[in-house]
Curated annotation (Swiss-Prot):
A Pfam family the protein falls into: TIMP
Disulfide bond sites: C25-C92, C27-C119, C37-C144, C146-C193, C151-C156, C164-C185
Record GO biological process: negative regulation of membrane protein ectodomain proteolysis; response to cytokine; response to hormone
Gene name for this UniProt entry: TIMP3
A GO term, aspect molecular function: metalloendopeptidase inhibitor activity
Site annotation Involved in metalloproteinase-binding: residues: N38
Signal peptide interval: 1-24
Protein name: Metalloproteinase inhibitor 3
Length: 212
């Protein structure tokens, strides 16, 4: 009887742990510009290899990458060879395919290693919009002093001059919404931040902060 109760306790603990892990990865929607500005490293790279590292209870996946271009992180790590992520998607680990695609990868540096996850911005390069690519090259950097405030229900108003109101959540698009795909929040000379879209330099075409 005692042995059976012991087995039941272990089973229930294992089941609870499994449920906890399955529900562990929850990410708050973030605009690509904020994802860029909050990252230590932003690169365009192709995955050329992977290896499961036996560290931690669930392991860590180490991806070997061929860096094509760096957009952020020159002073921290000018060349990235490895990207680390949790081996399990339930722990926010990302799954990248080897020798197939070029990816945009953002991440943070910890003890000399670049870590990324589902809550970081990563995407197949050919799925990025032209505006997002231009943002990576210079526009997002120009807006790192701005604050992008999500709007979950109307009305929404900017509470300071450096805010842009992000309304993609009103239609549940979030990261893949129209503003996320096509707009950057740029700071002007006067210190005001506004949404910007277009092919002219940011100081020539500025739109209203609440009207993307």
């Amino acid at each position: 009887m005692t042995a059976w109760l012991g087995f039941l306790a272990v089973f229930l603990c294992s089941w609870s742990l499994r449920d906890l892990v399955a529900e562990a990865c929850t990410c708050v929607p973030i605009h690509p510009q904020d994802a860029f500005c909050n990252s230590d490293i932003v690169i365009r790279a192709k995955v050329v290899g992977k290896k499961l590292m036996k560290d931690g209870p669930f392991g860590t996946m180490r991806y070997t990458v061929k860096q094509m271009k760096m957009y952020r992180g020159f002073q921290i790590m000018p060349h990235v060879q490895y990207i680390y992520t949790e081996a399990s998607e339930s722990l926010c680990g990302v799954k990248l395919e080897v020798n197939k695609y070029q990816y945009l990868i953002t991440g943070r540096v910890y003890e000399g290693k670049v870590y990324t996850g589902l809550c970081n911005w990563y995407e197949k390069w050919d799925r990025l919009t032209l505006s997002q690519r231009k943002g990576l090259n210079h526009r997002y950097h120009l807006g790192c002093g701005c604050k992008i405030r999500p709007c979950y229900y109307l009305p929404c108003f900017a509470t300071s001059k450096n805010e842009c109101i992000w309304t993609d959540m009103l239609s549940n698009f979030g990261h893949s919404g129209h503003q996320a795909k096509h707009y950057a929040c740029i700071q002007r000379v006067e210190g005001y931040c506004s949404w910007y879209r277009g092919w002219a330099p940011p100081d020539k075409t500025i739109i209203n902060a609440t009207d993307p």
